[in-house]
């Protein structure tokens, strides 16, 4: 995940609702480095949070494994991610796909969801609220398939 790309996706998503990042309420779901752990050292979530804070966003976060964290000079506390709390935010960003997250409930409660973990792949409702990283949203797709061989074959065949 590239933090600048995620921040750009948030900006583009909010623009759909005629909102800017400045003064928007953004909820980060998951700040840990990976799923179901408490370690957030070197987590890309921290860079995403810094970028959005620098753009004037009002950030909150939820992480069942990280009850508090330092962001710059501030200490943030994990908030409870109830449907009512989620609905208060202009955008929800799924940065770590903890097993405890009810993705269906998150999407149903949110106005806009930026899904960086493909955790909404099985949802069929509220798709208009979801922007997925690498899912044809004019952003790079991070595939595990190495298609460089396919490209080389096509080039060789065309000559």
Where are these regions (language model features)?
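Structural/interface elements that position substrates and couple domains in central-metabolism enzymes
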Residues: 1-159
């Amino acid at each position: 995940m590239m933090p600048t790309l995620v921040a750009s996706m948030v900006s583009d998503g909010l623009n759909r609702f005629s909102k800017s990042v400045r003064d928007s309420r953004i909820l980060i779901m998951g700040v840990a480095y990976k799923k179901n752990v408490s370690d957030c050292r070197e987590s890309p979530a921290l860079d995403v949070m810094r970028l959005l804070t620098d753009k004037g966003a009002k950030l909150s976060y939820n992480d069942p494994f990280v009850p508090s964290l330092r962001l710059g000079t501030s200490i943030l506390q994990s908030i409870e991610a109830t449907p009512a709390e989620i609905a208060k935010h202009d955008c929800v960003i799924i940065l770590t796909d903890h097993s405890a997250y009810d993705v269906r409930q998150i999407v149903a409660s949110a106005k806009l969801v930026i899904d960086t973990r493909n955790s909404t792949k099985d949802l069929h409702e509220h798709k208009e609220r979801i922007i997925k990283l690498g899912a044809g949203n004019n952003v790079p797709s991070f595939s595990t398939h190495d298609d460089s061989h396919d490209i080389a074959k096509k080039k060789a065949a065309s000559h």
